[in-house]
């Protein structure tokens, strides 16, 4: 019997580390490369440039040459930038009101009429985002998901733009004009009114404009007169054309759903029945009367909901040649979709399956082995796909 005792050392495996304070500070290395492109290019700038940033484009970079005024919606400026050569320049900022009467009667609000005018004797850049405030109290304002797009006009076509917050920024050169559509025009009293909304602004001339839309914004190019597209009226952001008459003639209403519910009023079986005559009705006439009353009430509720509460969905058919801007809608973002149809063949050739099976068998043979030990002590390793053959040999022996 072994009388040796085991002595446990509870602190044998512990390590003690001593921390010595050091007054030296090691500065981390600074990497000047951020891996992103420069947002501003204001050196030797001759023309105004607008660039949408990001995917989705929720911000825009604007570069402005000297002495060119820039108009931006109030609350949409994110940052201002000056380079070394223009750091001594002063950027003047003033408030200006645009189209107050139009916005007041169209949207019952004047917040979309307040713009900030920026001017400088040197070139500068700035970042802009669609930060709209529709209420005096910011906590009560409801901001929908919005993206930005740039519009560069060369004077060949005019643009009609719809929406309360569509125009975010534009350059104030002498060749760019933004005119609100007159809501009350005595000349159009005897003319046929257009089927689209009259709450639009016309942009004409040459220059850059920054637009905002609900959800994502896409451009559709209709190249020929035969090209046409049907758009939900709420999703139409802008449309181009040579004149207002040409734009008006290119848009027509496309009806998919008939107004049978609104137009076809149910006719009662019992006609000219007054409340004073109810006590004279028979039991069967009572049933018919209340059945007619039920159908009439149901029709009135459906008509009220479709016409006043829900609103009838209007589709507009637009003919080319022209460009159309569409927006996907509030709180919706759709990523870019490939234009070409891509088909994926999911079938696997039988030859490749056989090849894979053979490779799998060979791989299994590398790791499935049996060992034979002879009486003389020799050891022999052999690979095998399975042990059936080896078991049969052992049974025979």
UniProtKB/Swiss-Prot annotation:
Gene3D superfamilies: Mitochondrial biogenesis AIM24
Signal sequence region: none
Organelle transit peptide residues: 1-24
Keywords for the protein's UniProt record, in alphabetical order: Mitochondrion, Transit peptide
Subcellular location as annotated: Mitochondrion
Superkingdom: Eukaryota
GO BP annotation list: inner mitochondrial membrane organization
Chief location category: mitochondrion
InterPro entries xrefs: AIM24 (IPR002838), AIM24_sf (IPR036983), Trp_RNA-bd_attenuator-like_dom (IPR016031)
GO cellular component, one term: mitochondrial inner membrane
PANTHER family xrefs: ALTERED INHERITANCE OF MITOCHONDRIA PROTEIN 24, MITOCHONDRIAL
Family: Belongs to the AIM24 family.
Record protein name field: Altered inheritance of mitochondria protein 24, mitochondrial
Originating organism: Vanderwaltozyma polyspora (strain ATCC 22028 / DSM 70294 / BCRC 21397 / CBS 2163 / NBRC 10782 / NRRL Y-8283 / UCD 57-17) (Kluyveromyces polysporus)
Organism lineage string: Eukaryota, Fungi, Dikarya, Ascomycota, Saccharomycotina
């Amino acid at each position: 019997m072994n009388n040796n005792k085991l002595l446990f050392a509870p602190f044998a495996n512990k390590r003690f580390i001593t921390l010595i304070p050091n007054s030296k500070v090691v500065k981390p290395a600074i990497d000047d490369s951020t891996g992103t492109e420069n947002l501003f290019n204001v050196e030797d700038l001759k023309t105004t440039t607008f660039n949408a940033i990001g995917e989705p484009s929720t911000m825009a970079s604007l570069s402005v040459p000297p002495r060119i005024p820039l108009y931006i919606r109030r609350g949409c400026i994110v940052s201002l930038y000056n380079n070394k050569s223009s750091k001594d320049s002063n950027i003047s900022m003033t408030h200006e009101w645009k189209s107050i009467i139009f916005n007041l009667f169209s949207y019952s609000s004047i917040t979309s009429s307040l713009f900030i005018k920026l001017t400088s004797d040197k070139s500068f850049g700035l970042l802009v985002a669609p930060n709209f405030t529709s209420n005096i109290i910011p906590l009560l304002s409801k901001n929908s998901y919005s993206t930005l797009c740039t519009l560069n006009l060369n004077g060949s076509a005019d643009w009609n733009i719809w929406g309360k917050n569509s125009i975010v920024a534009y350059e104030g050169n002498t060749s760019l004009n933004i005119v609100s559509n007159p809501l009350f025009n005595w000349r159009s009293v005897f003319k046929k009114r257009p089927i689209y909304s009259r709450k639009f602004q016309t942009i004409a001339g040459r220059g850059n404009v920054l637009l905002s839309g609900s959800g994502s914004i896409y451009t559709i190019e209709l190249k020929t007169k035969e090209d046409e597209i049907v758009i939900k009226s709420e999703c139409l952001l802008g449309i181009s054309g040579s004149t207002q008459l040409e734009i008006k003639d290119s848009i027509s209403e496309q009806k998919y759903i008939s107004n049978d519910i609104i137009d076809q009023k149910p006719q009662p079986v019992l006609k000219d029945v007054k409340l004073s005559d109810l006590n004279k009705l028979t039991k069967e006439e009572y049933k018919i009367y209340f059945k007619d009353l039920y159908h009439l009430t149901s029709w009135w509720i459906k008509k009220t909901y479709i016409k006043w509460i829900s609103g009838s969905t209007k589709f507009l058919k637009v003919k080319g040649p022209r460009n159309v801007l569409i927006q996907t809608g509030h709180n919706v973002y759709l990523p870019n979709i490939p234009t070409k149809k891509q088909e994926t063949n999911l079938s696997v050739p039988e030859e490749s399956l056989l090849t894979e099976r053979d490779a799998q068998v060979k791989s299994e043979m590398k790791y499935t082995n049996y060992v034979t030990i002879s009486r003389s002590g020799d050891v022999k390793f052999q690979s095998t796909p399975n042990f059936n053959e080896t078991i049969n040999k052992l049974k025979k022996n």
